[in-house]
Amino acid sequence: MYIAIYGKELGIRSGVGIFFSLMSVGLIFSRLIGGKLVDRGQLVKVVSYGTFFCLMGFFALAALNKIKHYNSSMVVGLFYVIALVLGVGYGLIFPAYNTLFVNLAPNNRRATASSTYMTSWDIGVGVGLVLGGRLADARGGLPLAYLVGAFAVAFSLMFFMRIAGPHFERNKLR
């Protein structure tokens, strides 16, 4: 996520470790709520909500550099609010997608489905970090990388709502 570098670029002196602590709070909070919604059959909504939170978080990260020029004191607060928002988003998405994959697989393939999801997540994070770093170095810095990431999340949300979510509802086994 390059958040430590970006925090320094924004002039945040209070330490970006707070960012990850607040992100953890968001993760824990969202897992409590998301789990109950999934138990009530709201899996597609949980994925959609989580993706929306991530979308807002990435758009806000991209905007922080511009906001800094108008109100630098506001940037620190927003930076930490974004941590909570991203924590909620990731906390909703990660376990919900795993449940989605497992619920599409027959009983004897559930572990394979979960492993496939985890591997896909890892590959996506790795590729995203490399592409984001190259984009930031070559073009417009980290704000551009976060903006491109936000558009990728927007595309994934549309894809999920139009194709993957309905496919899951039609084909789920549990």
PLM region spans:
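Short amphipathic helix-loop junctions that connect adjacent transmembrane helices
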Residues: 1-15
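Loop-to-transmembrane helix entry/capping segments in MFS-fold secondary transporters
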Residues: 13-14, 107-117
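Transmembrane alpha-helical segments of major facilitator superfamily
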Residues: 18-27, 121
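Helix-to-loop junctions at the C-terminal end of transmembrane segments
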Residues: 30-43, 136-137
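Structural signature of the two symmetry-related core transmembrane helices
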Residues: 45-60
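Intracellular juxtamembrane helix-capping segments at the cytosolic ends
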Residues: 92-105
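A membrane-interface helix-boundary motif in multi-pass transporters
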Residues: 134-152
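Multi-pass alpha-helical transporter architecture, strongest
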Residues: 149-174
